[in-house]
């Protein structure tokens, strides 16, 4: 009598074959892609944000864009700190990194805004769309202009700053939830293609 492996073992072997095929397809498509890019936003730097974005090629007319922005700084009595992640999909009408594109994107932000006597802390979750244009400066450098708008849901807390709480004042915390229509992207960016 011949011993057969259990049925679940056969499924694992098939899953390994499928996984190998999927990895091979991604490897082939990645080697087919001529270049990706790294960029930084000048408007973000002017606002005091440390920022960078990575673009990964998907095909001839599409790229995956992953920008990250961080601002951990305080200026005297004012605080405007945040971490923002905005993954998006860019569809290029001519070819990657050339000409006009549209870009739907998601947004996640964790922020603290403190000024005057109040501090606001919260998260923001949103979705938006932007339009942009990329101009080739040289073989490896591009200049990108992008502007976008979106809807953001933000649950946050509002507190009176502790140094402003007097002897007879009560410390309070308000909890808010809001939907906001906001400009989500305002980019003047230099992009390096590799």
For the regions a language model picked out, list residue spans one by one:
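Positively charged n-region of N-terminal signal peptides that target proteins for export
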Residues: 4, 10-18, 34
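Bacterial N-terminal signal peptides
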Residues: 20-27
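Extracytoplasmic loops and strand-loop junctions of Gram-negative outer membrane beta-barrel proteins
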Residues: 35-37, 113-116, 168-174
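Gram-negative (and chloroplast) outer-membrane scaffold detector with strong preference
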Residues: 56-145, 190-192
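Short, solvent-exposed beta-strand-terminating loops
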Residues: 147-161
């Amino acid at each position: 009598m011949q011993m057969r492996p259990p049925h679940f073992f056969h499924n694992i072997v098939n899953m390994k074959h499928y996984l190998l095929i999927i990895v091979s397809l991604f490897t082939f498509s990645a080697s087919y892609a001529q270049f990706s890019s790294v960029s930084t936003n000048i408007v973000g730097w002017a606002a005091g944000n440390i920022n960078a974005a990575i673009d990964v090629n998907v095909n001839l007319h599409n790229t995956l864009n992953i920008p990250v922005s961080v601002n951990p700084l305080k200026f005297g009595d004012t605080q405007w700190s945040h971490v923002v992640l905005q993954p998006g999909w860019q569809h290029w009408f001519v070819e990657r990194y050339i000409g006009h594109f549209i870009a739907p994107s998601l947004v996640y932000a964790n922020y603290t805004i403190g000024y005057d006597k109040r501090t606001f802390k919260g998260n923001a979750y949103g979705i938006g769309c932007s339009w942009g244009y990329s101009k080739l400066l040289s073989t490896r450098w591009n200049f990108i202009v992008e502007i976008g708008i979106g809807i953001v849901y933000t649950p946050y807390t509002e507190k009176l700053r502790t140094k402003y709480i007097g002897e007879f004042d009560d410390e309070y915390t308000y909890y808010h939830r809001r939907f906001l229509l906001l400009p989500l992207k305002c980019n003047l960016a230099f992009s390096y293609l590799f």
